Regions:
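Acidic/histidine-rich helix-loop elements
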Residues: 2-14
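Short catalytic/ligand-binding loop motif for oxyanion handling, primarily in non-cytosolic enzymes
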Residues: 2-5, 41-42, 63-65, 88-93
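C-terminal domain-boundary segment and adjacent tail
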Residues: 11-47
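Conserved, mostly hydrophobic/aromatic
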Residues: 26, 58, 72, 81, ...
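Hydrophobic faces of well-ordered beta-strands that scaffold small-molecule active sites
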Residues: 33, 55-57, 79-81
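A short, conserved beta-to-alpha structural element at the edge of catalytic cores
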Residues: 76-102
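Extended, charge-rich helix/loop segments that form flexible
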Residues: 93-177
Length: 177
Protein backbone atom coordinates (compact mmCIF):
# COMPACT_ATOMS: atom_id res chain seq x y z
CA UNK A 1 0.00 0.00 0.00
CA UNK A 2 0.96 3.63 -0.14
CA UNK A 3 2.33 3.58 3.40
CA UNK A 4 2.70 7.26 4.13
CA UNK A 5 -0.88 7.98 3.04
CA UNK A 6 -2.45 4.94 4.67
CA UNK A 7 -4.56 4.74 7.81
CA UNK A 8 -1.60 3.38 9.81
CA UNK A 9 1.56 4.74 8.17
CA UNK A 10 3.81 3.45 10.96
CA UNK A 11 2.80 -0.19 10.62
CA UNK A 12 5.75 -1.93 9.02
CA UNK A 13 5.18 -2.89 5.44
CA UNK A 14 6.53 -2.49 1.97
CA UNK A 15 5.50 0.66 0.14
CA UNK A 16 3.64 -0.13 -3.08
CA UNK A 17 6.10 1.80 -5.25
CA UNK A 18 9.05 -0.15 -3.86
CA UNK A 19 7.12 -3.39 -4.42
CA UNK A 20 6.59 -2.42 -8.08
CA UNK A 21 10.33 -1.76 -8.43
CA UNK A 22 11.11 -5.14 -6.87
CA UNK A 23 8.73 -6.93 -9.25
CA UNK A 24 10.25 -5.16 -12.25
CA UNK A 25 13.74 -6.06 -11.06
CA UNK A 26 12.79 -9.71 -10.64
CA UNK A 27 11.11 -9.78 -14.04
CA UNK A 28 14.35 -8.54 -15.63
CA UNK A 29 16.85 -10.64 -13.70
CA UNK A 30 15.03 -13.80 -12.62
CA UNK A 31 12.63 -16.43 -13.87
CA UNK A 32 9.43 -16.07 -11.84
CA UNK A 33 7.83 -19.49 -11.60
CA UNK A 34 4.44 -20.76 -10.47
CA UNK A 35 3.63 -23.17 -7.69
CA UNK A 36 2.52 -25.64 -10.36
CA UNK A 37 6.01 -25.52 -11.88
CA UNK A 38 7.55 -26.24 -8.48
CA UNK A 39 5.22 -29.18 -7.89
CA UNK A 40 5.81 -30.54 -11.40
CA UNK A 41 9.56 -30.23 -10.89
CA UNK A 42 9.42 -32.16 -7.62
CA UNK A 43 7.00 -34.82 -8.85
CA UNK A 44 8.90 -35.44 -12.08
CA UNK A 45 12.43 -34.76 -10.83
CA UNK A 46 12.84 -32.01 -13.42
CA UNK A 47 15.17 -29.09 -12.73
CA UNK A 48 13.60 -25.68 -12.54
CA UNK A 49 15.22 -22.92 -14.61
CA UNK A 50 18.26 -21.20 -13.13
CA UNK A 51 17.60 -18.05 -11.12
CA UNK A 52 14.01 -19.11 -10.47
CA UNK A 53 11.89 -17.21 -7.98
CA UNK A 54 8.60 -18.26 -6.41
CA UNK A 55 6.60 -15.32 -5.06
CA UNK A 56 5.09 -15.98 -1.63
CA UNK A 57 3.16 -13.69 0.68
CA UNK A 58 2.56 -14.40 4.35
CA UNK A 59 -0.57 -13.54 6.30
CA UNK A 60 -2.96 -12.92 3.35
CA UNK A 61 -3.75 -9.34 4.29
CA UNK A 62 -6.42 -7.38 2.43
CA UNK A 63 -3.49 -5.19 1.30
CA UNK A 64 -2.27 -8.18 -0.68
CA UNK A 65 -5.57 -8.51 -2.51
CA UNK A 66 -6.04 -4.78 -3.03
CA UNK A 67 -2.46 -3.85 -3.93
CA UNK A 68 -0.30 -6.89 -4.72
CA UNK A 69 -2.76 -8.95 -6.73
CA UNK A 70 -3.46 -6.24 -9.36
CA UNK A 71 0.28 -5.83 -9.98
CA UNK A 72 0.82 -9.57 -10.33
CA UNK A 73 -2.23 -9.82 -12.57
CA UNK A 74 -0.96 -6.98 -14.78
CA UNK A 75 2.21 -8.96 -15.51
CA UNK A 76 0.46 -12.37 -15.56
CA UNK A 77 2.47 -13.48 -12.52
CA UNK A 78 1.38 -15.88 -9.83
CA UNK A 79 1.91 -15.51 -6.12
CA UNK A 80 1.18 -17.93 -3.31
CA UNK A 81 -0.67 -16.34 -0.40
CA UNK A 82 -0.61 -18.04 2.98
CA UNK A 83 -3.36 -17.17 5.43
CA UNK A 84 -2.75 -17.94 9.12
CA UNK A 85 -5.30 -20.57 10.10
CA UNK A 86 -5.80 -19.24 13.64
CA UNK A 87 -6.92 -15.85 12.37
CA UNK A 88 -9.49 -17.54 10.13
CA UNK A 89 -10.75 -20.36 12.34
CA UNK A 90 -10.86 -18.34 15.55
CA UNK A 91 -11.77 -14.97 13.97
CA UNK A 92 -9.00 -13.28 15.91
CA UNK A 93 -6.19 -10.83 15.37
CA UNK A 94 -2.83 -12.55 15.75
CA UNK A 95 -0.56 -11.36 18.56
CA UNK A 96 2.15 -10.41 16.07
CA UNK A 97 -0.34 -8.10 14.33
CA UNK A 98 -1.45 -6.65 17.66
CA UNK A 99 2.18 -5.89 18.48
CA UNK A 100 2.66 -4.14 15.12
CA UNK A 101 -0.47 -2.08 15.82
CA UNK A 102 0.71 -1.18 19.34
CA UNK A 103 4.09 -0.07 17.99
CA UNK A 104 2.47 1.93 15.20
CA UNK A 105 0.06 3.61 17.59
CA UNK A 106 2.66 5.30 19.76
CA UNK A 107 5.60 7.44 18.80
CA UNK A 108 6.96 7.30 22.34
CA UNK A 109 8.57 3.85 22.47
CA UNK A 110 10.33 4.72 25.74
CA UNK A 111 6.94 5.20 27.38
CA UNK A 112 5.90 1.78 26.05
CA UNK A 113 9.10 0.25 27.45
CA UNK A 114 8.27 1.84 30.81
CA UNK A 115 4.76 0.37 30.68
CA UNK A 116 6.31 -3.03 30.06
CA UNK A 117 8.60 -2.45 33.02
CA UNK A 118 5.57 -1.92 35.24
CA UNK A 119 3.79 -4.97 33.81
CA UNK A 120 6.85 -7.18 34.34
CA UNK A 121 7.03 -5.92 37.92
CA UNK A 122 3.29 -6.57 38.39
CA UNK A 123 3.53 -10.18 37.14
CA UNK A 124 7.01 -10.90 38.55
CA UNK A 125 5.99 -13.03 41.54
CA UNK A 126 3.10 -14.82 39.83
CA UNK A 127 5.27 -15.89 36.87
CA UNK A 128 8.63 -16.03 38.68
CA UNK A 129 10.09 -13.45 36.31
CA UNK A 130 13.55 -11.98 36.38
CA UNK A 131 13.98 -8.28 37.07
CA UNK A 132 13.06 -6.03 34.16
CA UNK A 133 16.69 -4.97 33.66
CA UNK A 134 17.65 -8.59 32.98
CA UNK A 135 15.21 -8.75 30.06
CA UNK A 136 16.15 -5.33 28.75
CA UNK A 137 19.88 -6.11 28.73
CA UNK A 138 19.26 -9.47 27.12
CA UNK A 139 16.81 -8.37 24.41
CA UNK A 140 17.40 -4.69 23.58
CA UNK A 141 19.79 -5.05 20.65
CA UNK A 142 19.25 -2.64 17.76
CA UNK A 143 18.95 -4.18 14.32
CA UNK A 144 19.27 -2.85 10.81
CA UNK A 145 15.53 -2.11 10.74
CA UNK A 146 14.55 -1.40 14.34
CA UNK A 147 15.81 0.54 17.35
CA UNK A 148 16.84 -1.35 20.46
CA UNK A 149 13.57 -0.37 22.18
CA UNK A 150 11.45 -1.72 19.33
CA UNK A 151 13.48 -4.93 19.22
CA UNK A 152 13.08 -5.27 22.98
CA UNK A 153 9.30 -4.83 22.78
CA UNK A 154 8.98 -7.34 19.94
CA UNK A 155 11.21 -9.99 21.51
CA UNK A 156 9.69 -9.68 24.96
CA UNK A 157 6.14 -9.94 23.63
CA UNK A 158 6.77 -12.55 20.93
CA UNK A 159 9.17 -15.05 22.48
CA UNK A 160 10.74 -14.27 25.83
CA UNK A 161 7.83 -14.47 28.24
CA UNK A 162 5.67 -17.56 28.67
CA UNK A 163 2.80 -17.65 26.21
CA UNK A 164 -0.12 -16.99 28.55
CA UNK A 165 1.65 -13.96 30.04
CA UNK A 166 2.57 -12.66 26.59
CA UNK A 167 -1.09 -12.92 25.61
CA UNK A 168 -2.23 -11.05 28.76
CA UNK A 169 0.24 -8.23 28.24
CA UNK A 170 -0.35 -7.92 24.49
CA UNK A 171 -4.13 -7.86 25.00
CA UNK A 172 -3.80 -5.20 27.72
CA UNK A 173 -1.67 -2.96 25.50
CA UNK A 174 -3.76 -3.63 22.38
CA UNK A 175 -6.91 -2.58 24.21
CA UNK A 176 -5.20 0.58 25.42
CA UNK A 177 -3.76 1.63 22.07
Amino acid sequence: RDLKNSRYPDIKGLDINLFKKQINYMRKHYHIITMEEVIYSIDNQVKIPEKSVLLTFDDAYSDHYNNVFPILDKYKLQGSFYAPSKAITEHTVLDVNKIHFILASTEDKINLVNELKELVKFYQKEYQLEDFDYYYKKLAQASRLDTKDVIFIKRLLQVELVEDLRIKIVDTLFEKY
